[in-house]
């Protein structure tokens, strides 16, 4: 029995405008997490990087809690064993870059490594488990499978289709200092939307798949949103203003996930041409698509 496991899990950006709760992509920004079995009960948790001073250092830590749940579900003979968790975090937390999905996915992958040593990850099983915990698969699917994913729930089953992103498309995230809890970003959404807005949303979401894969010249139109970003503007005015500035320059730009990070996507030339846009209060990262969670 192998008593230590290490995994890398990517940041993810969900929604991409109109693909609310169903489209997401993995980016090459990583958390590296390892676990070792102790010869005594209890837990040790060491965190460096993002969240080091804010995340809990006990059993309530999301990676640890998910790891414990995964050990039980996978039939590990000692699910209450003492564990030493080490996390080196590069994914900003509560910024709309899938930090909670990364924690859930890394916990489940670590559990798999302990319970099934030597066996490759069953990504389908991990996705089912992660979606059950998260409640929606838009971040979990790319975190596990990598690349861009269209994912949806059918009862308890998770379906997904990988999207082959046009190689000309690159990504830039603008990460602000401020946080916006996902729960708060969901609370401001209306229970119902106008039918005209719904029709526009369906059109844009359909166009988004084509724009991402074969026709990137349509990305600006394909990333327009009517059902969630307008209602969240008041929670993240700086992010909304930056999105407006970049879109006004012709660059496809959205709020990443529940925000407040801003995601711009297009060709390298397009992104270089907006390097002069005022981004005070944000840190920019140029990224490409990432692979899914993996042992290393």
Curated annotation (Swiss-Prot):
Cell compartment(s), UniProt: Cytoplasm
Pfam family, one: GHMP_kinases_N
Residues annotated as binding ATP: 92-102
Catalysed reactions, as listed in the record: L-homoserine + ATP = O-phospho-L-homoserine + ADP + H(+)
InterPro entries membership: GHMP_kinase_C_dom (IPR013750), GHMP_kinase_C_sf (IPR036554), GHMP_kinase_N_dom (IPR006204), GHMP_knse_ATP-bd_CS (IPR006203), Homoserine_kinase (IPR000870), Ribosomal_Su5_D2-typ_SF (IPR020568), Ribsml_uS5_D2-typ_fold_subgr (IPR014721)
One cellular component (GO) term of this entry: cytoplasm
GO annotation terms (biological process): threonine biosynthetic process
E.C. no: 2.7.1.39
Pathways involved: Amino-acid biosynthesis; L-threonine biosynthesis; L-threonine from L-aspartate: step 4/5
Domain of life: Bacteria
Family: Belongs to the GHMP kinase family. Homoserine kinase subfamily.
Protein name: Homoserine kinase
Gene: thrB
């Amino acid at each position: 029995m192998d008593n230590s496991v290490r995994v890398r899990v990517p940041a993810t950006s969900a929604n991409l405008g109109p693909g609310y709760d169903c489209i997401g992509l993995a980016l090459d920004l990583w958390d590296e997490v390892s676990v070792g079995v102790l010869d005594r009960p209890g837990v040790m948790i060491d965190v460096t990087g993002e969240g080091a001073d804010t995340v809990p250092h006990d059993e309530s830590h999301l990676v640890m809690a998910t790891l414990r749940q995964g050990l039980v579900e996978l039939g590990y003979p000692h699910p209450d064993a003492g564990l030493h968790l080490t996390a080196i975090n590069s994914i900003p937390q509560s910024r709309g870059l899938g930090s909670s999905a990364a924690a859930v996915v890394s916990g489940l992958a670590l559990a798999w490594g302990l319970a099934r040593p030597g066996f490759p990850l069953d990504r389908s099983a991990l996705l089912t488990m992660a979606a059950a915990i998260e409640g929606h698969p838009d971040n979990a699917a790319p975190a596990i499978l990598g690349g861009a994913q269209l994912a949806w729930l059918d009862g308890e089953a998770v379906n997904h289709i990988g999207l082959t992103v046009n190689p000309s498309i690159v990504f830039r995230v603008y990460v602000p200092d401020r946080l916006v809890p996902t729960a708060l970003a969901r609370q401001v959404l209306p229970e119902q939307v106008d039918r005209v807005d719904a029709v526009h949303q369906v059109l844009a979401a359909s166009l988004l798949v084509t724009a991402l894969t074969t026709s990137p010249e349509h990305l600006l139109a394909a990333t327009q949103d009517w059902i969630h970003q307008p209602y969240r503007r008041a929670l993240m005015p700086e992010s909304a203003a930056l999105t407006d500035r970049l879109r006004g320059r012709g660059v496809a730009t959205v709020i990443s996930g529940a925000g407040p990070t801003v995601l711009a996507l297009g060709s390298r030339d397009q992104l270089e041409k907006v390097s002069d846009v005022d981004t005070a209060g944000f840190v920019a990262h140029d990224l490409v698509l990432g692979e899914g969670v993996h042992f290393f």
